[in-house]
C-alpha cells in the first residue's frame, strides 16, 4: 500500500489526506504536539472549521512523531501556511530519502525573500532530492471537496515524470489532477490570485455588482500574467486551472478566506482584528506585500496590487480604492510599464483568405 505523509493539520492538509485515504492509500498526518495527536486520534473529527458530519477516513491516522509519519512514505506533502514552510521543511529534510516525492500545497510567497515554496524547499533539502519536488495548486475550495463535490487540480514539477508520479498518488474519484512542467507559473498563479480575491471581497462588500467584479478579476489576471511573465512563467499556464481557474473560484466564493477578509474590510474592521479572529490563514495578506515590493523593484505597473496594498497596510479607504481601480482614464487595456504584454499578445496580421474557385 502506498503511503503519504502530510505535514500540517490545516483544513487543506486534512482535506488532501481525506482524498488520498478514501482512495485506499495510507495517510499519516503529523501533529506538532502529542495533545493534538491524541485529540485528533480519539475524536476522529479535527476541528470546528470542518463540516459537522466529517470524520477521519479509515486509512488516515495521526502521530506526533515526525519519524513515524515520514518513514516509508512515497510522498511528503506540506500543507502549511507559506510563512511556515521553511521551518517545517527544515524539520523534514533530515528524514527524506531519494525515493520520496516532496510536494508543496501552499499558495504564497515568502516574506523577505519573495521566494516561491518550491524554491524554499530547494534551499533546505539535499540537492540530490531536488528532482523530487512538486507543487499542487488549482481551483480547490476545501469545504466543497470535503462535501464530495468534484474538483480538479494541477501537479507541477520540473519533469513530466515526477508530475505524473505525484498525480497518480493524489487523483481520486472526485478529484482529478492534470500535470504541468511550468512550476513557476503554477505557483505564481496560486499565490497571486489571492491578492485579487481580496479585491473581489471589497467589491462584493461594497455591493458594486458583477460588472465591477468581472472587471477587477480580468484586470487582476492581466497583472498576474505580467508579473508571472517577468519572473519566467508561461502566460498560458496563468490562463489555465492554476491561474484563471483558481482566480475565478477564489474571487467568486464566500468560502474563500481572502474574499472574506476583503468583505470584512469594507465593514470598517481593522486588518489585525480580522486576522486575529480567523481560524485559518488568509495568504493574500502577506502575498500582497511581497508582490507589491517585487513590482516596485522591477518597475512594473500593478494598480490592483498597489491599491489592495494601500488598503491593507496604509489604511486606505476600500471605497476610494475601488473607485480608483474603476477609473480607466482611456488607457489601452494591455498598457503597463514594462509589462511587455503587447509583445506577447499582439495581434498578428491576418492572412488573406483565399478566394474559392466557383468551379
UniProtKB/Swiss-Prot annotation:
Recorded metabolic or biological pathway in which this protein acts: Membrane lipid metabolism; glycerophospholipid metabolism
Pfam families: NAD_Gly3P_dh_C (PF07479), NAD_Gly3P_dh_N (PF01210)
Annotated active site: 193
Molecular function in Gene Ontology: glycerol-3-phosphate dehydrogenase [NAD(P)+] activity; NAD binding
Catalytic activity: sn-glycerol 3-phosphate + NAD(+) = dihydroxyacetone phosphate + NADH + H(+); sn-glycerol 3-phosphate + NADP(+) = dihydroxyacetone phosphate + NADPH + H(+)
InterPro entries: 6-PGluconate_DH-like_C_sf, 6PGD_dom2, G3P_DH_NAD-dep, G3P_DH_NAD-dep_C, G3P_DH_NAD-dep_N, NAD(P)-bd_dom_sf
Class of the enzyme per the UniProt entry, highest EC level: oxidoreductase
Protein name: Glycerol-3-phosphate dehydrogenase [NAD(P)+]
Amino acid at each position: 500500500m502506498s503511503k503519504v505523509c502530510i505535514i500540517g493539520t490545516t483544513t487543506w492538509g486534512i482535506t488532501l489526506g481525506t482524498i488520498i485515504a478514501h482512495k485506499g492509500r495510507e495517510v499519516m498526518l503529523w501533529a506538532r504536539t502529542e495533545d493534538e495527536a491524541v485529540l485528533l486520534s480519539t475524536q476522529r473529527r479535527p476541528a470546528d472549521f470542518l463540516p459537522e458530519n466529517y470524520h477521519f477516513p479509515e486509512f488516515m491516522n495521526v502521530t506526533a512523531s515526525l519519524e513515524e509519519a515520514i518513514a516509508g512514505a512515497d510522498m511528503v506533502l506540506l500543507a502549511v501556511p507559506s510563512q511556515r514552510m521553511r521551518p517545517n521543511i527544515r524539520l523534514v529534510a533530515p528524514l527524506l530519502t531519494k525515493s520520496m516525492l516532496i510536494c508543496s500545497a501552499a499558495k504564497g510567497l515568502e516574506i523577505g525573500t519573495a521566494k516561491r515554496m518550491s524554491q524554499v524547499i530547494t534551499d533546505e533539502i539535499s540537492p540530490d532530492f531536488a528532482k523530487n519536488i512538486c507543487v499542487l495548486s488549482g481551483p480547490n475550495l476545501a469545504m466543497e471537496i470535503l462535501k464530495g463535490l468534484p474538483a480538479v487540480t494541477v501537479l507541477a514539477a520540473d519533469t513530466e515524470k515526477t508530475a505524473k508520479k505525484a498525480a497518480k498518488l493524489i487523483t481520486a474519484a472526485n478529484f482529478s489532477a492534470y500535470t504541468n512542467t511550468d512550476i513557476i507559473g503554477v505557483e505564481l498563479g496560486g499565490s497571486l490570485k489571492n491578492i485579487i480575491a481580496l479585491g473581489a471581497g471589497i467589491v462584493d462588500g461594497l455591493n458594486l455588482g458583477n460588472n465591477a467584479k468581472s472587471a477587477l478579476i480580468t484586470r487582476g489576471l492581466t497583472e498576474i500574467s505580467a508579473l508571472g511573465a517577468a519572473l519566467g512563467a508561461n502566460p498560458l499556464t496563468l490562463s489555465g486551472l492554476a491561474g484563471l481557474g483558481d482566480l475565478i473560484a477564489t474571487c467568486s466564493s464566500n468560502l474563500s478566506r481572502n474574499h472574506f477578509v476583503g468583505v470584512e474590510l469594507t465593514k470598517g474592521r481593522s486588518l489585525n482584528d480580522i486576522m486575529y479572529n480567523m481560524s485559518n490563514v488568509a495568504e493574500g495578506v502577506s502575498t500582497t506585500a511581497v508582490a507589491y515590493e517585487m513590482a516596485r523593484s522591477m518597475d512594473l505597473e500593478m494598480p490592483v496590487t498597489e491599491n489592495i496594498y494601500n488598503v491593507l497596510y496604509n489604511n486606505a479607504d476600500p471605497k476610494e480604492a475601488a473607485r480608483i481601480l474603476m477609473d480607466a482614464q482611456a488607457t489601452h487595456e494591455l498598457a503597463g510599464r514594462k509589462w511587455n504584454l503587447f509583445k506577447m499578445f499582439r495581434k498578428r496580421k491576418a492572412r488573406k483568405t483565399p478566394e474559392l474557385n466557383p468551379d
